[in-house]
Amino acid sequence: MLGSVIARPLAERGFQVLIQSTRGTFGSGGVFDPFRFEREDGLATLEWVVKQPWFGAAIVLAGGSYLGYVQWAVADSLPPEVKAIIPQVTESALTLEFLRKDGLTLETPFSWGVMVAGQERRGALLRGMAQVRRNRRALSTLPLGQADVAAIGHHSDYVQDVLAYDADQPRWAGIDHRHRVAQVSVPVCSIGGWYDIFLPGQLRDFLILQEAGRPARLMVGPWTHISADGTALRESIEFGLAHARGEQPPPRPPVRLYVMGEEAWRDFDSWPPGGYLPQRFHLQPDGALASQPPGESASDRYRYDPADPTPAVGGVRMGRGSGRVDNTALEARPDVLTYTTAPLEEDVEVIGEVSAEIWFRSSLPHADVFARLCDVDPRGRSRNVCDGLVSLSGADELICAAVRLWPTAYRFKRGHRIRVQVSSGAFPRYARNPGTGVPHATATRLLPADQEVYHDGAHPSAVILPVRQAQ
């Protein structure tokens, strides 16, 4: 499959393409331990390649997801024959993105762990859709530590490790290559998507390169993890071929972003671009959203029931139905609050990091807050722009929940409205909060919670957007 999807387009343009199986997979010796041996094996592979009689004097490393991560694993020790690297939809500390302290990402690591556990079985690709349905059912298993058994009949070591070990525990030592990023000595072309799971880490890596003065380009398109189009391929080939030949790609500013809403590519000198200032849009009574601070008002309430969890709709997911989608049905649920501006009198352009501060109280000490930014068109259709979740302890006391949403580049057009959703979950993208404080892997009880969102002068809940008024 990789041969036809990745190798053929590159080979047709003059590259010799080498795709390597990870240790312990598809006939490769040793034991498969995801992410563990990629530095050791990657450096050994590069040493072998340059000694081959067919080697043509220049190497470009390219690939997405895991195939991008392995580039960062060797980035600070590249032989001189490597002329450029092109990591796509990836970052230098891959698994750690799933283990963020602000909320356990569930669906992606579970699906990937289940997939690699059976990837060498006969007919694995043909059984893919049936496996997706089994995974969906399995993710509701209690305790969650048995979900992989429900999906594939046995435990997945990777899934068990994700459920059992926090990001700072020794199990993950050696798979974090963030410290290598600033030491890369060759040009980098980093390609990502606004709805990709690894985008925050990918932008962090680019910032490191930028601050270290390394030669680097960034392209971010309107893509999910698996939906990049020919634009990304053309960028890779143009950049890779030029450096392989000892030339420079056509000059342009280092950052190229697809601005959604405007539906156009724009070039910038840096990430985040200059000239965008944080603007607070405050939650108001009666579901309003406005730039002025709120006055006195009562809190809004909803009940979150993990036995009927608020579903993940679109957004940062791996499979079908991800990305920008219609949120009408989601917003009709009683466990989702919405706050919406009046129709905009002029375009509002948002590019950069997005966050929210939600004053919140739950009937239980353990709760989650999910915030989503949406664009509502003149027909009333609400489509998601970016979102994020934070898990709270001590939530039975009034607390300001700081939610880090995904970065974005979006133009809200005149006549449209800006909307913020507030809820307590996006299952199965994020693990549902059982409300008991028991670890996800072992929790067997699910407690419903009554939630309150405050928006008054003393508790000014808001979404903070990096805004430049469009001319």
Question: How should each PLM-predicted stretch be described?
Answer:
Residues 1-51, 99, 106, 365, ...:
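Cap/lid segment of the alpha/beta-hydrolase catalytic domain
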Residues 2-6, 12, 73-183:
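Accessory cap/linker subdomain of secreted extracellular hydrolases
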Residues 53-66:
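Alpha/beta-hydrolase fold nucleophile elbow
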Residues 61-63, 88, 191:
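Short beta-strand immediately N-terminal to the catalytic nucleophile in serine-hydrolase-like folds
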Residues 184, 190-192:
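Short beta-strand/loop motif that positions the catalytic acidic residue
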Residues 197-203:
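Conserved alpha/beta-hydrolase "acid-adjacent" motif
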Residues 210-226:
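Catalytic histidine neighborhood in serine/cysteine hydrolases
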Residues 211, 232-234, 247-471:
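Glycine/threonine-rich phosphate-binding loop and adjacent beta-strand/alpha-helix elements that clamp
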